[in-house]
């Protein structure tokens, strides 16, 4: 009996060690699962982040491509304000300073009314204005002796040199550019530019027969004060119409080129280019 009791104890004794080993193995497995789960979750989260970044990046490419493909009238790549020069003249034409713009347009309108409707001549108007100004100042200066008041302070007027030089330089550059364009058109290198120049001069000759130079200048000034501002507000509606018109003009020019212009003999400069 004692031997059996010892044998039973020897059999029962190892059980706690086995249980400890099993528990350790279970803990290891659980920790491994937790570790792998964290890795997978982190990898999945990183992959999700990458997917989200891709999703956010994908819509930007078509919008940028659409922006680059938007047609602008006359192929402009800058705002209307920059096209007009971007300085004070552009501010006036775009009505950035409403008082100054209204003053310039009102002065031009008054001058047109005086010279065109009232049929005043420029030299006559200048002489009459100078007569009135000199007479008023002369009488005022002499009248101060009798009424014991100070004479009028007549300001000294000087024309600054720098603005005049800048204006002359700008005019010189534009005139030289116009001369070079006319020379290029007359040399026979570009038939398309030649036809555009002839059509433009023909339209101007018709307008010149209907209006005098002062009226044409006033109409051009009014257009400068109205058309750029209206186009800047409604460019999204005007540009598609301009694109359709340009496509139609190109089609008509292609037909004209095929039937008429291609049969016209070109100048020697064009033949030299081909050689």
From Swiss-Prot:
Domain Reticulon: 89-274
Entry-linked Pfam families: Reticulon (PF02453)
UniProt membrane topology term: Multi-pass membrane protein
Parts of the chain that traverse the membrane: 99-119, 120-140, 194-214
GO biological process entries: endoplasmic reticulum tubular network organization; response to bacterium
Keyword terms, alphabetized: Acetylation, Cell membrane, Endoplasmic reticulum, Membrane, Transmembrane, Transmembrane helix
Region annotation (Disordered) ranges: 1-68
UniProt-listed PROSITE patterns: RETICULON (PS50845)
Coiled-coil residue spans: none
Record field: compositional bias (Basic and acidic residues): 1-10, 20-38
Induction description: Up-regulated after Agrobacterium infection.
Main localisation: endoplasmic reticulum
Subcellular location: Endoplasmic reticulum membrane; Cell membrane
Residue(s) carrying N-acetylalanine: 2
Tissue specificity statement from the Swiss-Prot or TrEMBL entry: Predominantly expressed in root tissues.
Feature: compositional bias, Low complexity: 59-68
Phenotype caused by lack of the gene: Shows reduced levels of Agrobacterium-mediated root transformation.
One GO cellular component, as annotated: endoplasmic reticulum
Function, in words: Plays a role in the Agrobacterium-mediated plant transformation via its interaction with VirB2, the major component of the T-pilus.
Subunit structure, interactors included: Interacts with VirB2.
Descriptive protein name: Reticulon-like protein B1
Organism: Arabidopsis thaliana
UniProt lineage: Eukaryota, Viridiplantae, Streptophyta, Embryophyta, Tracheophyta
